[in-house]
Amino acid sequence: MNIIHVKNYEEMSQKAAALLFERIQQSPKITLGLATGGTPENTYTALIAKAKENGQSFSHVQTFNLDEYVGLPAEDKNSYRHYMEQRLFDHIDIPKEKTHLPNGMAPSLEEECRAYENMIADAGGIDIQLLGIGSNGHIGFNEPGTPFSSKTHVVELAEETRKANARYFPTLEDVPKQAITMGIQTIMEAKEILLLISGKAKAEAFAKLCSDEVTEAFPASILNKHPNVTVIADEEAASVYTQKAHL
């Protein structure tokens, strides 16, 4: 793993946006894997700014998001489709038909999972996958214990994950209990991975990631086996690892 240490969240966001923008500029056709949540928000803001400053088109870009809640229609303000439209898609010239998220309202969720995998394969795979990490090591919605061989699947959300996402909903009860997520193998098949880690709440997770122990009990640990991973971590996220390194 190539680890880039930065001062704070804003510097992490700027560096991530610069890396993504470079890939978009350099490629006549590119497929991005995208993430949601608090971590990538400012990365998208910075990416939009770079696109406007440089007159960069996104018409050659295709995107696949990691996950979507089950039971929320796309227009629901808490759906990940809505998140992506608000924070990125509505501000760039990417055709809507080239932006993909799992359909959490599909009549057959199993068929939707298979169809999503097939769409990724038909696109030629993901060129660069943007990731965050949960405090328990989850990537996407792949909770501890998820097989490394997993493909896109329906997952029961861990209570810890639901509580972490409750700030976006009126109450904890309103947070969906299931989601569709790319599997760990799906994520690992991306040609390049960009992992963003920020804040004290992720410090233990970053330290575990750097321990090199690969175990399904800590899903992100598999990233140590990927040949092309860049991690951008701020000082707070790196604090526990830094302390241990000096012991």
Swiss-Prot record:
TM regions (residue ranges): none
Hydrolase as UniProt keyword: yes
GO CC terms: cytoplasm
Reaction(s) the record says it catalyses: alpha-D-glucosamine 6-phosphate + H2O = beta-D-fructose 6-phosphate + NH4(+)
Active-site residues from the entry: 67, 136, 138, 143
Keywords, alphabetical: Carbohydrate metabolism, Hydrolase
SUPFAM superfamilies named in the record: NagB/RpiA/CoA transferase-like
Cited InterPro entries: Glc/Gal-6P_isomerase, Glucosamine6P_isomerase, Glucosamine6P_isomerase_CS, NagB/RpiA_transferase-like
Pathway of action: Amino-sugar metabolism; N-acetylneuraminate degradation; D-fructose 6-phosphate from N-acetylneuraminate: step 5/5
Enzyme kind, highest EC tier: hydrolase
EC assignment: 3.5.99.6
Signal peptide: none
Hydrolase recorded as keyword: yes
Listed GO biological process terms: carbohydrate metabolic process; glucosamine catabolic process; N-acetylglucosamine catabolic process; N-acetylneuraminate catabolic process
GO molecular function, one term: glucosamine-6-phosphate deaminase activity
Family: Belongs to the glucosamine/galactosamine-6-phosphate isomerase family. NagB subfamily.
Function: Catalyzes the reversible isomerization-deamination of glucosamine 6-phosphate (GlcN6P) to form fructose 6-phosphate (Fru6P) and ammonium ion.
HAMAP family (UniProt xref): GlcN6P_deamin
NCBIfam families reported in the protein's UniProt record: nagB (TIGR00502)
PANTHER family: GLUCOSAMINE-6-PHOSPHATE ISOMERASE (PTHR11280:SF5)
Record protein name field: Glucosamine-6-phosphate deaminase
Protein's organism: Shouchella clausii (strain KSM-K16) (Alkalihalobacillus clausii)
Gene name tied to this protein: nagB
